[in-house]
C-alpha cells in the first residue's frame, strides 16, 4: 500500500505585530517572510494519521510505504527532513518559481503541480490532503486534485486504519451521520478536524538514521510544461487579493472597585439587570 501526503506550511500569524496588520490592510500585502513557518493544522493531522497507519500495518505484516510532498520553497526542507526521520520513504519538494504570499490563493496552480508530480510517480493507493490551509483557506486544492486525477474523493475524514488487502477503514463525518466504510484505492481522503493528532517529534536516533535520505526536488517549470491545456492555471483563472485585515479580538470592559463580596455581587446584579 502506497500513501501520499500532500502538506502545506504557513507563516505563524500569531507572531505578526499589529502594525504589520495595519500596513497590510491598506496595501493588500503582508510581509510574512520573517515569521516562523509551521505545519498547517489539517495537514499535520493527516501526517500523523499516516504514521499511525504505517505502524499498524507493520504490526499486521502489511506493506505500507508513505511519501510526503509539498509545494513551496526551500524553507520547507526542515519539515521534509522531519518527515524522513518519522519514516516517510519519499520526501519531495515542488519548488515554486515565485513563492509570494498571494500565490497561496492560486488553488488551480497548486493542484496542477501536484497532478503533474503524481503522474510522474509510481501509482499511489491513497492520497491524503488537509481540509484547507491557514492562509488561503479556500479548501479547493483536494477537490481539484481528485477531479484532475479522476479518482474518488472522501471529505471530512476523521479516522483511518488498515483493513487488509491494501484497503483502509475510513471514518468520515457527514451532515447527520458518521460513516465508516472500507475504501480501496485509488482514493483521495480529505482530513478534517481531529482531536489529539499532533505530529509526533522524531527522536535523535531517528534523525541520525535518516541523515542520508535525500529530498527530491522538482521545479515548477519542469512540471508546468506537462500541464494539460484544460488544467493550465493561465486558462482557469486566478484569485487576486484586494484587501486584508485582522479580526478584532478586543472587548469592551468595565472595572468595579468593590472589595466586599456581597457589595460586588449587588453591583454585578444591577449591571446585568439591564440585559434581562
What are these regions (language model features)?
Residues 30-46:
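Short, glycine-rich nucleotide/cofactor-binding loops
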Residues 89, 125-126, 186:
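Conserved acidic residues
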Residues 43-58:
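Histidine-anchored nucleotide/phosphate-binding helix
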Residues 1-26:
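Positively charged, low-complexity intrinsically disordered leader regions
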Residues 17, 157-276:
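Electrostatically charged, flexible surface regions
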Residues 118-125:
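Glycine-rich phosphate-binding loop signature in dinucleotide/nucleotide-binding domains
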Residues 78-113:
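A glycine-rich helix N-cap at a beta->alpha junction
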Residues 136-149, 153:
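Short Gly/Thr/Asp-enriched flexible loops that form oxyanion-binding sites at enzyme active sites
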Amino acid at each position: 500500500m502506497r500513501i501520499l501526503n500532500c502538506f502545506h506550511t504557513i507563516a505563524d500569524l500569531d507572531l505578526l505585530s499589529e502594525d504589520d496588520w495595519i500596513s497590510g490592510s491598506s496595501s493588500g500585502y503582508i510581509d510574512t517572510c520573517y515569521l516562523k513557518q509551521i505545519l498547517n493544522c489539517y495537514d499535520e493531522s493527516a501526517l500523523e494519521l499516516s504514521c499511525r497507519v504505517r505502524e499498524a500495518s507493520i504490526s499486521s505484516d502489511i506493506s505500507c510505504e508513505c511519501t510526503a510532498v509539498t509545494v513551496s520553497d526551500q524553507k520547507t526542507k526542515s519539515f521534509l527532513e522531519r518527515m524522513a526521520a518519522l519514516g516517510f520513504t519519499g520526501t519531495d519538494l515542488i519548488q515554486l518559481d515565485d513563492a509570494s504570499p498571494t500565490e497561496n490563493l492560486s488553488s488551480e496552480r497548486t493542484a496542477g503541480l501536484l497532478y503533474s508530480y503524481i503522474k510522474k510517480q509510481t501509482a499511489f493507493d491513497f492520497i491524503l490532503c488537509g481540509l484547507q490551509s491557514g492562509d488561503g483557506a479556500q479548501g479547493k486544492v483536494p477537490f481539484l486534485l481528485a477531479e484532475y486525477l479522476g479518482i474518488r474523493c472522501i471529505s471530512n475524514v476523521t479516522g483511518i486504519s488498515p483493513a487488509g488487502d491494501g484497503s483502509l477503514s475510513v471514518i468520515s463525518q457527514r451532515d447527520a451521520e458518521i460513516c465508516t466504510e472500507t475504501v480501496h484505492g485509488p482514493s483521495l481522503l480529505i482530513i478534517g478536524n481531529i482531536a489529539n493528532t499532533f505530529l509526533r517529534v522524531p527522536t535523535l536516533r531517528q534523525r541520525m538514521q535518516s541523515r542520508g535520505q535525500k529530498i527530491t526536488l522538482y521545479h515548477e517549470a519542469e512540471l508546468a510544461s506537462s500541464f494539460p491545456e484544460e488544467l493550465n492555471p493561465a486558462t482557469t483563472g486566478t484569485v487576486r487579493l484586494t484587501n486584508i485585515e485582522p479580526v478584532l479580538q478586543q472587548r469592551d470592559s468595565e472595572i468595579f472597585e468593590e472589595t466586599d463580596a456581597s457589595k460586588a455581587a449587588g453591583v454585578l446584579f444591577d449591571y446585568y439587570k439591564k440585559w434581562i
